[in-house]
């Protein structure tokens, strides 16, 4: 039977050693689902609330026992007494949103609500004997995503003196996901060798990318291009580059202040100068995607950037849109950006996540399914990427098990789909003039 008989949450640890929420759901028939909730380092101010305890004597205030209690003492009784079917995802998600009663899930916590939402979906898939991607996407979920591999970490994700948070490679010239993963791995290892030869650090950051002390942004870019060529691939044809600028992390009082991360030599740019700078980088290097190139509240700057390079570069809103359909709708109406980053914990339920992806795709925006810097062994985002035919996934570098787990899950899915599996490569950037 599909009726849920037990919902249980516990406090576990994420990839940074910080507490997070794990939720388990059980049905009458024994179907079971488990979910672990991720956590971000650089967060948009409009994100749903991640509930932390604030007790400095325990986990430095980062405990999640309040969120766990909210699952076990508030959400679980509501689901069990209401005799909800595990197959009724939308009703359960809406019930939790109503039970919270705040616009940002600040009462129960998005980390509590999301854990239940994903665990319910996993239990439903188990009940039906289906893989999660097939339960979520039906027979039409068959497109494997282009991986956006974050091989150099800067900004808030590392101690490297570079303002931009992520430098990514995208193997769009591959013909299968399996091949794209191999290309990325070969480039990653070539990059490590090049860094070692230069006497630079090869320790990795939160998302598995290297965090050496480059001599600035262009040094990082040119070193990555060198690694692509050393691996035997053609930059700008087979492999493109991408940035996550995370501009909100160094924007203050109308100024993009690179010195926050780059020290006394870091530039200070107005919005117009920031647009000019990003355009110069796009003109000089094979860049296909830029995330959060402008501050989340600098909508005039976003408009300028979109008008300037939005026809040839994917401009992804992360802190800008925070997986929120109300904000995304405003962005679509005003021609802001051309893509949305999808992070399940920014909004807090699977239902709202799927609504955001659908809205973006209907408007001709791309949707990039993404991890967080604080991750776990949970692989749900891999299944979501295939279920929604998103075409792109951002889940870190080619090291750290919390990142590799998602890539390995995509390899399994590609194998399961066999001849029906698609990898569209450059065609996944369907709204660009490429």
UniProtKB/Swiss-Prot annotation:
Annotated phenotype, changing residue 355 to A: Significantly impairs homooctamer formation, no enzymatic activity
Broad EC category: lyase
Keyword annotations of the record: Cytoplasm, Glycolysis, Lyase, Magnesium, Metal-binding, Secreted, Virulence
SUPFAM superfamilies, sorted: Enolase C-terminal domain-like, Enolase N-terminal domain-like
Any GO BP: glycolytic process
Residue numbers binding phosphoenolpyruvate: 41, 343, 372-373, 394
Impact when changing residue 135 to A: No longer forms homooctamers
Cofactor binding annotation: Binds a second Mg(2+) ion via substrate during catalysis.
A Pfam family of this chain: Enolase_C
Ranges in a coiled coil: none
Effect after changing residue 389 to A: Slightly decrease in homooctamer formation, octomeric form has about 50% activity, dimeric form has none
Active site: 207 (proton donor), 343 (proton acceptor)
UniProt-recorded name of the protein: Enolase
Taxonomic lineage from the root: Bacteria, Bacillati, Bacillota, Bacilli, Bacillales
């Amino acid at each position: 039977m599909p009726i849920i008989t037990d919902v249980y949450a516990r406090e576990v640890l994420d990839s940074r050693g910080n507490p997070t929420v794990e939720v388990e759901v059980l049905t009458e028939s024994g179907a079971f689902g488990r979910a672990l909730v991720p956590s971000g380092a650089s967060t948009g101010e409009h994100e749903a609330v991640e509930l932390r305890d604030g007790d400095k004597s325990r986990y430095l205030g980062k405990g999640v026992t309040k969120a766990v209690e909210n699952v076990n003492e508030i959400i679980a009784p509501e689901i069990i007494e209401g005799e909800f079917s595990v197959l009724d995802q939308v009703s359960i998600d809406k019930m939790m949103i109503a039970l919270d009663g705040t616009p940002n899930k600040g009462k129960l916590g998005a980390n509590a609500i999301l854990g239940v939402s994903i665990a319910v979906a996993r239990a439903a898939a188990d009940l039906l004997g289906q893989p999660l991607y097939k339960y979520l996407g039906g027979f039409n979920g068959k497109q494997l995503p282009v991986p956006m591999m974050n091989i150099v970490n800067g900004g808030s994700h590392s101690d490297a003196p570079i303002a931009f948070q992520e430098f990514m490679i995208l193997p769009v010239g591959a013909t299968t996901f399996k091949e794209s993963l191999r290309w990325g791995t070969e480039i990653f290892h070539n990059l490590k060798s090049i860094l070692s030869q230069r006497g630079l650090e090869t320790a990795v950051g939160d998302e598995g990318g290297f965090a050496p002390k480059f001599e600035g942004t262009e040094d990082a870019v040119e070193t990555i291009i060198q690694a692509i060529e050393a691996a035997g691939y053609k930059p700008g044809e087979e492999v493109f580059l991408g940035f996550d600028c995370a501009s909100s992390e160094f924007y203050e009082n109308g100024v993009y202040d690179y010195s926050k991360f780059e020290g006394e030599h870091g530039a200070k740019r107005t919005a117009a100068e920031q647009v000019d700078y990003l355009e110069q980088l796009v003109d000089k290097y094979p860049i296909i995607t830029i995330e959060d190139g402008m501050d989340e509240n600098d909508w005039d700057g976003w408009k300028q950037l979109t008008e300037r390079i939005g026809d040839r570069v994917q401009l992804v809103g992360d802190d800008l849109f925070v997986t929120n359909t109300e904000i995304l709708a405003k962005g679509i109406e005003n021609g802001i950006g051309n893509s949305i980053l999808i992070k399940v914990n920014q909004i807090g339920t699977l239902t709202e996540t799927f609504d955001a992806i659908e809205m973006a795709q209907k408007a001709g925006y791309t949707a990039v399914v993404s991890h967080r810097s604080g991750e776990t062994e949970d692989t749900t985002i891999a299944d979501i990427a295939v279920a929604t035919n998103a075409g792109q996934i951002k889940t870190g570098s080619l090291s750290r098990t919390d990142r590799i787990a998602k890539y390995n899950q995509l390899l399994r899915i590609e194998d399961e789909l066999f001849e029906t599996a698609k990898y569209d490569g450059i065609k996944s950037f369907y709204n660009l003039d490429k």
